[in-house]
Amino acid sequence: MEINKLVCFSFSLVLILGLVESFHYHERELESEEGFMGMYDRWREQHNIEMRSPERFNVFKYNVRRIHESNKMDKPYKLKVNEFADMTNLEFVNTYANSKISHFQALRGSAPGSIDTDPNKDFIYANVTKIPDKVDWREKNAVTDVKGQGGCGSCWAFAAVVALEGINAIRTGKLVKFSEQQLVDCDMTNAGCDGGLMEPAFTYVIKHGGIAPEASYPYVGKRETCDKAKIKDVLKIDGRQNVPGLDEEALRKAVAHQPVATGIQLSGHGLQFYSEGVYTGDCGTEPNHGVGIVGYGENEKGIKFWTVKNSWGPTWGEKGYIHLQRGARKEGLCGVAMHSSFPIMNDPNPPKDDPNGPKDDPDAPKDPKFKTTQRLQGIRTKLLEL
């Protein structure tokens, strides 16, 4: 059976889980070849990149110049020289964003954004009339720390878990990390590290009795055999819901009540090097990456935004988050309003004070550190051969 798949941006590079300091440079270094070479060598050392080639150096120069010029403009967002500075945007997109949701929708006979496009069809928040001007579920202790998916294309699992963790915290008052690895290993309707969708992940949780805490079923960054012995102290949900497509107001109603999983297209020079602020730049509307929306608001200049949690670790963007402009187009900027869904949890299960409910293990190991240097070198070697 043909299914849509989000084959995720899988950050198998150095920033995934280990913190990397920001890369700084002086404007005068951009004035000479020697200055650029010094920057390039310093950047390679910071990111543990052994390869030193004229082609990569030329791309590095091109990207640094574009980043520098962009940051001199009056834009509501800033860019930074990150670990992708020696990759062209085409290489970046082809390497980390090679899935086209619209392609799979066409095979199924669906139009883009056709998920529940009838605004009132089963949408539980359709009749909500009053919602706050600003919501940030991080401030309400409903969002866990930013995680890292590593070299596994499991963004769909991380996005689904953002929504599951959020609704559990809202209903029970307990913030618990849940297991992306269980979804990667056990949800056979999705493709593990080769991509997937959030809606089938929610359906798996419903049909298979729940999702375990991360402490019981920790993340390893690859698909393994489903280990049912680790599935205990589970969170159960009562259903799932799609947000009407091409409708940011419907999406805002949903996010006002709980974190939501969605798909976006992360492409374009700006997103490759995004650092901070409200992103208003170029990107497409063919979602290829799963993320969680954990809030919305408006900045001091009146630009409306979505607060989006990514799964590339805390050193990308704004400590692992990106603010995407809200209200830019019917699909939402980067297609954020085209493919959104959330779990339904009517009552705490177990009840709030049940000692047998899901809980974090304070002694559980943190996310594993992925060995990335060899993989990084392999990517660059392959790009040079193209």
From Swiss-Prot:
Cysteine protease. Hydrolyzes casein and synthetic peptide Boc-Val-Leu-Lys-7-amino-4-methylcoumarin (Boc-VLK-AMC) in vitro. Keywords: Allergen, Autocatalytic cleavage, Disulfide bond, Glycoprotein, Hydrolase, Protease, Signal, Thiol protease, Zymogen. This is Cysteine protease Amb a 11.0101. Coiled coil: none annotated. Glycans are attached at residue 127. It comes from the Eukaryota. Residues 6-20 are annotated as: T-cell epitope. MHC class II peptide able to activate CD(4+) T cells of the ragweed pollen-allergic patients indicated by significantly increased IL-2 production compared to non-allergic individuals. Not recognized by IgE of the patients allergic to ragweed pollen. Its EC number is 3.4.22.-. GO terms for biological process: proteolysis. It comes from Ambrosia artemisiifolia (Common ragweed). Residues 1-22 form the signal peptide. Disulfide bonds join 152-193, 186-226, 283-334. SUPFAM superfamilies: Cysteine proteinases (SSF54001). PROSITE patterns: THIOL_PROTEASE_ASN (PS00640), THIOL_PROTEASE_CYS (PS00139). Homodimer. Residues 340-377 are annotated as: Disordered.
